[in-house]
Amino acid sequence: MENIETILRLAEDKILLVQNLKALQEYKVEFLGKNGIVTGELKKLGSLNEQERKEFGLKINKLKDKIQNIIKAKAEILEEQELNFKLAADKIDLTIPARRYKQGSIHPITQCSEELIQVFSQFGFTIENGPNIENDFHNFTALNFEDDHPARQMHDTFYLKSQENNKPLLLRTHTSTVQIRAMKNGKPPFRFIAPGRTYRSDSDMTHTPMFHQIEGLVMDKNINMGHLKYVITTFIKSFFENSNIELRFRPSFFPFTEPSAEVDIRMNKNDKWLEVLGCGMVHPNVLKNVGIDSSEYQGFAFGLGVERFAMLKYNIKDLRQFFEGDMRWLKHYNFGSFDIPNLAGGLTK
């Protein structure tokens, strides 16, 4: 009995002074392990008679339970201490300046495209899309390009090795290809724009091998140049947010429109005229190529370069800067992620 009390006091004294869970586990093994002190006392049962064995066994089990409870209580204290220490170490010092949050922004081409689409949506234009890789028919033949037209030459068009109908496929040189596909697969009336990337073999301050276009088509019965001029004039004034802007429609030539015109603008009377887009009435041959009766339906088409409009509106001097990835330039000309253009609030914030 005295030995059991001695073991209990020894366990209490040692466990009380424990400073960490690792040391506590070592004392658990020392007292309750396979070769521990309490286990050693249990081995004495074999030398006792039945009555003594019963009484001594009961005392040993109580000793074991007390030591287990002492260890459990100490473990809870140590675990709480370790948790508090960890929380204190991980505590955020709110007085330290926060790191700058890196947030993406909207590229001026993307912003300009959204603004252009927003304006045309006010006229009820929908959006049509088409493939970047095209065949000769959709890119040239259906649009009334002659076989010897300069645009078909290698120095103007990117041709691919793959062929279709014994003619090489190509990267589309305009989004007019989308108009052809839409007219072939649908029935008039039409009123849509076709935004997308286009490709031409050219590179300087005002040209890049890849650029963005938006082409539009309106087709119905009794459509005329008056409708074209109204849409273009209203669109230009809305996009540049300037009701006093001057426009002039200058006669021109495009294989797929007749009559054709190029549109020039100037913000003030003393400014030079700037060419911004081409347009015209859809050529009867184009309608014939897509199976539409030109005696019943007429339409007008127009095409503009997104980069050109972005340069004019945001005062960007060199077209190549759009694609150089200069972070300083992008930071200067970028737009906020939530700068969503709308006519009511003003297109560009």
From Swiss-Prot:
SUPFAM superfamilies hit by this protein: Class II aaRS and biotin synthetases, tRNA-binding arm
A single GO BP: phenylalanyl-tRNA aminoacylation
Top-level taxon in the UniProt lineage: Bacteria
UniProt subcellular location: Cytoplasm
GO function term, MF aspect, one: tRNA binding
Keyword presence, Ligase: yes
Enzyme class of the recorded protein, top EC level: ligase
Subunit note: Tetramer of two alpha and two beta subunits.
Name listed for the protein in its UniProt record: Phenylalanine--tRNA ligase alpha subunit
Species annotation: Rickettsia peacockii (strain Rustic)
